[in-house]
């Protein structure tokens, strides 16, 4: 019987908001997750350079984007923005990625980590950590996105 070793993958998780993007990453075996400082969003997407630097520094091989679906699992305005940004990021970074339903991740991180009224981005990065932990448990696998994204920022 032949066994296949799982391919190591260090993943970046993004909790995308209108003002900031919370960030977290995991080790190659997806055992531990850590937060990174949240990055400010800029109109001209300068934050992609910062995200690229983290990807290079931590040797990350893919990323996941939290999609805030509503209670019925339907796309919200924010979910559409997150989806479009994820596709843009995949194109710019040339990395595989996946979407994860992050319904209530900010509420959960506020309760779980005791963070209230945060303007530093800490709650955003802890939300990214929760999204990452959910992805580690549930999947789905990362996918390559071919072609250029249709929506530009």
From Swiss-Prot:
Keyword DNA-binding: no
Keywords: Cytoplasm, Hydrolase, Nuclease, Ribosome biogenesis
Domain of life of the organism encoding this protein: Bacteria
GO CC annotation: cytosol
Any single GO BP term: rRNA 5'-end processing
EC number: 3.1.-.-
Enzyme class: hydrolase
Cytoplasm listed as a keyword: yes
GO molecular function: nuclease activity
Entry's localization field: Cytoplasm
InterPro entries documented for this protein: RNaseH-like_sf, YqgF, YqgF/RNaseH-like_dom, YqgF/RNaseH-like_dom_sf
Major localization listed first in the record, in broad terms: cytoplasm
Any Pfam family: RuvX
Family statement drawn from the similarity comment of this UniProt entry: Belongs to the YqgF nuclease family.
Function in brief: Could be a nuclease involved in processing of the 5'-end of pre-16S rRNA.
The protein's name in its UniProt record: Putative pre-16S rRNA nuclease
């Amino acid at each position: 019987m032949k066994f296949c070793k799982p391919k190591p993958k260090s993943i970046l998780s993004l909790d995308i908001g209108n003002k900031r993007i919370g960030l977290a990453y995991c080790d190659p075996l997806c055992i531990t997750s850590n937060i990174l400082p949240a990055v400010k969003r800029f109109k001209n997407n300068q934050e992609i350079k910062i995200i690229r630097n983290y990807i290079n520094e931590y040797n990350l091989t893919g990323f996941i984007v939290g999609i805030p679906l509503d209670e019925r699992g339907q796309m919200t305005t924010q979910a559409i923005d997150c989806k479009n940004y994820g596709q843009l990021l995949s194109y710019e970074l040339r990395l595989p990625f996946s979407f994860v339903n992050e319904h209530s991740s900010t509420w959960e991180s506020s309760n779980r980590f005791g963070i209230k009224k945060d303007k530093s981005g800490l709650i955003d990065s802890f939300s990214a950590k929760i999204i990452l932990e959910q992805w580690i448990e549930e999947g789905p696998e990362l996918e390559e996105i071919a072609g250029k994204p249709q929506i530009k920022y």
